Amino acid sequence: YIPIYLIKNNIAKKVIASDINKEPLNKAKINAALDGVSDKIDLRLGGGLYPLKNKEAQAVIIAGMGGNLIRDILENDLDKVRNLDYLILQPAQNPEVLREYLYKNDYEILDEDLCIDENKYYELFKVRYKKGDYISLESIFYEISPFMLNKKLPLLKSYIESKIDKNKKVIEFITDDTEHAIQR
């Protein structure tokens, strides 16, 4: 859906969409045809940035996977990453792992945002590779972004509250003295 949106809203003239599995690409092909944009979307099978040639794109969107996998994709194709104007990253889990990697590995954070979909929060990053931009933060700031704190995002308070609730549940689980917990 993202490639179709980019074309239909004149954000991009041409889009390369890739996936490691054939089925999502087949669905994308059908959706692109239904929306009349098949000629502007190049569908490619492959994982990570592998299907992309070096210097072929200005920007890349990596979304719908965990922060660990996004980090690995960036690390595995650093030559391609260095030649991009920017990347949009949306980890489905572990955004703190990705944030720490970005800060410690020469990425400039251009923007960060939050969204919520079906009661699940998602963090979004707009970044670019910039040699010499190594920054180390206190560990709490990998969990809660200083960028988002400074922007005072509307969803930030409820996002932090949800993280606190989740951590309280983990603490309750590991300190539970029920018979079942004792057996664990």
Regions found by a protein language model. Give the residues of each.
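Conserved SAM-binding loop of SAM-dependent methyltransferases across substrates and taxa
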Residues: 1-12
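A short beta-strand submotif of the Rossmann-like class I SAM-dependent methyltransferase core
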Residues: 62-63
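Residues at the starts of beta-strands that form the adenosine-phosphate
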Residues: 13-14, 40, 86
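S-adenosyl-L-methionine
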Residues: 18-58
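Class I S-adenosyl-L-methionine
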Residues: 50-51, 56-59, 68-184
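Short helix-capping segments at alpha-helix termini
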Residues: 10-11, 33-38, 79-82
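Hydrophobic/aromatic beta-strand patches that form the interior of the parallel beta-sheet core
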Residues: 16-18, 44, 88, 125
